[in-house]
Amino acid sequence: MTELTTPIYPLQRNWSWWFLNDDRNASWQDRLKKVYTFNTVPEFWAFYEAILPPSGLNDLCDYNVFRDDIQPKWEAPENWDGGRWLIIINKGKTPEVLDAVWLEILLALIGEQFGKDMESICGLVCNVRGQGSKISVWTKNCNDDDTNMRIGVVLKEKLMAAASKAHSKPLFDVIHYQTHRNCVKKTTSALKYKFSLKSIV
């Protein structure tokens, strides 16, 4: 009798999940920990279903899912010349919207749905904040406008499709692209964006 085995469904690369806790008395470096590395679909779902969704995290916590060889830090060599596509989830949105946006982009990322531009993507970040949470896709080269715009278009398409299936309204109003160096040097809450894509034109 042949024993049935669970399909492995390997991913094309290793991904690491990092968690930033909300300990206000600790340094940022001490708060950030790598908690899991996965490279198959079953490994991903086993971990994902065992943890809290973003909406269940405390204020000031972050989830980061990055290629295993890249740390989720601006100063990392792979990130310093890069930027991010930023989605702001206003506090008026329901918790389900935050979780839906996070999962939709996460599945697109580990499923290699950005095609040849996957090599330009470093990882995905969710910053849980009381005044409005942020989800961002980090890219390697902020000056590669064509690649970054293609990534943004795929993001928009994925989120618009997800909204049409399960939500009566778009999951986002606008997504922006900004450079990491601009974020690091910011002196006000107003940041310059290189590109913006609206959910409804």
From Swiss-Prot:
A GO cellular component annotation in the UniProt record: eukaryotic translation initiation factor 4F complex
Record SUPFAM superfamilies: eIF4e-like (SSF55418)
Keywords: Disulfide bond, Initiation factor, Protein biosynthesis, RNA-binding, Translation regulation
UniProt keyword RNA-binding, yes or no: yes
Effect of C122S: Unfolded protein
Effect of mutating C126S: Unfolded protein
Cystine pairs: C122-C126
GO aspect biological process, one term: regulation of translation
Keyword presence, RNA-binding: yes
Pfam families cross-referenced by the UniProt entry: IF4E
A GO term, aspect molecular function: translation initiation factor activity
Tissues in which the UniProt entry reports expression: Enriched in the germline.
Function description: Recognizes and binds the 7-methylguanosine-containing mRNA cap during an early step in the initiation of protein synthesis and facilitates ribosome binding by inducing the unwinding of the mRNAs secondary structures. All 5 eIF4E proteins bind monomethyl cap structures. Only ife-1, ife-2 and ife-5 bind trimethyl cap structures which result from trans-splicing. Translation of trimethyl cap structure mRNAs may be regulated by intracellular redox state; disulfide bonds change the width and depth of the cap-binding cavity determining selectivity to mRNA caps.
Oligomer status and interactors: eIF4F is a multi-subunit complex, the composition of which varies with external and internal environmental conditions. It is composed of at least eIF4A, eIF4E and eIF4G. eIF4E is also known to interact with other partners.
Stated family: Belongs to the eukaryotic initiation factor 4E family.
Protein name listed in UniProt: Eukaryotic translation initiation factor 4E-5
UniProt lineage: Eukaryota, Metazoa, Ecdysozoa, Nematoda, Chromadorea
Gene: ife-5
